[in-house]
Every structure is written in C-alpha cells, then in structure tokens.
Amino acid sequence: MAVICLVRPYDGQAQTSMVREHQPIKRMVTERKLKQQIDILCDSIHAGRAAGEKGGGLTARWIQSEFERLGLLKFGSSYGHGVLLGNGRFGRNIIGMLPGSKHFSREKYIIVGAHYDHLGILEGKMYPGADANASGTVALLNIAEMLSAFRNTGRDHDYNVIFVAFDAKESNMAGSKRLWRMIQNGELVNPQSGARITKDKIAMMVNMDQLGCTISPLKSGRKDYIIMLGNDSLKPIKRDMLRICNRTYAIDMEIDYTYYGSKNFTQMFYRLSDQRIFVDNGIPSILFTSGITMNTNKTYDSPETIDTEILRKRIFLIYHWLDRML
C-alpha cells in the first residue's frame, strides 16, 4: 500500500472515476478491429513485409495513413524516414509525435515502438508474421489512438510521446539503430518547438514485440499473461505500476518480469529486439511480449493463430500503464 500511495494516492471513489473515464476510449478497440488490422498486415499484397522490398514499402504507406488519421505530428515533411540497408536498398521508419501538456516542460519524451517488418518471401513461401510482429504493430496503433483520444478529452500528459513503427528489425535492427543516429546527430527535432531531441531528454523507451499468442504460457498455464522485461531499469517507485494498473482496471492478467524464470534467457531475450540500442545507451527500456513460440519465423505464423481477446487485454494493460507513466 505504501508504494501505491507514493506513486499516486487515490481513494476508492477517485479510482472508480478514473476507471470510468477510460471506458469510452477503450470501446474503440474491438477484437474485430484488431483482427482486421492484423489481416491487412499479413495480406499477400504486403508479401511478408520484408524491409527494402515492395511489400515492406506498401506496409509503410499504410502505417503512415494510420498515423495521419490519428493526427500525430510529423517530424519534417513526412512520417517516413529512410533506413539504409545496403545493396542500394532502403527501408523506412514511420515516426509521429503526440504532444504533451502545455503546462509542463515540452522537452521530455517517451518513445513507444514496435517493428512492422518481417521475413518476406523466402524460397517462394510467404512468411506472414502475424505474431512477429503484426501483433505489436497493431498494439502500437491502438495505443496511439487511445492516448490521442484521451488527449482530445482535455487530459494532457507531462511527456511528449514519440511513436515509432520500426523497419528492418530483421536486418540487424537497422531501423532502431537509424533512429538512435538521428538522435545523436541532432536530426530529430520537436515539430512544435523546433528543439533538438537529445539523449538527456528521453525518459524511457517502450517496445512491443510479439504480443498476440497464448501458446507459450507461464508456469500456471493461464492464457492471459504478459511478460515485461526491463522493469528494473525504472525508478524503484515505478516498478510496481504494471501490477497496480492490472488490479485497478480489473484486467487481471498474469505478469512475469522474467523470461520464463530464467536469468540467462531474460538477459538474452532483452537484447533481441529494438530496445537494445536504447539499453546500450543508458535509456531505461521496457519490452512487452508474450514470448517466442513454435510458430515464430515460420510460414504458419498466420492471423488465425492470434488470440485477439488476449491481445486486446494486453493492449489495455500497456495503455493504462503508459497513461500512468506519462
């Protein structure tokens, strides 16, 4: 109870009010909508979303149209930012910003990302990548939509949120490395203030990679679980926030802060996705995942393997956690 009070002291009436104010916003995220978005990303027109290929480019265009629909601010003239892949090929990170409160410092940022690329077509076979990582991509889009809608009700957050759909994770994480170089080189500029976004202004990076499956459960065997890695990189006062949100908003998922209880696998898996470059540069970084499964990087990682009911719950939990962290 002491931790809860330190983080944000709410009495029962205030908690009830807080839960209610999110309900209209959460109704925007339906299982049907999640399925439709995953189907789009896994459609044959996107050809497995390989970085630098036509299918990857079409996927980038679709994500840009979603960012436009949500009203996210562009960095420069476009949401798309090139990623050099070699051999004359280019990928594209899609980057947009949701502004923070006018009443607080405008130069504080949290980066929220998910990679949208996958393996493409290999030896004539398409790899749809439904869990890896259409699931994380639709989580990114729906969290951006909910936070944007919440802002439109008059509720601002202290931090600016930079949403990034990374390309080229499957190409040695070239997309996230490119974003970091933009930050290092002063290329990432606040679209409102014109100030350069530097390392010292980034409070946290949050990555979502493989959130859609339930076939690799934790010890209890429950389907409704989520794995959060990097929690110990946060300030101690914030480390219980996911559990607080899980309880406060009656989401009631099983939470693990390790990769299936193994210290070695936790350390290894924590470095296998786009948060790695931020970890290496001292930025507190979080990975949300449901874990690698026997479908990962297989042709049968397809939309019908996604549990949209559980994916929706995971999205809600991450959304509420972000709302409290912002």
Q: Which ranges hold each PLM region?
A:
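Second-shell loop/turn segments in exported
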Residues: 20-28, 44-54, 81-85, 124-133, ...
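N-terminal hydrophobic or amphipathic helices/low-complexity stretches enriched
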Residues: 12-58, 63-65, 69-73
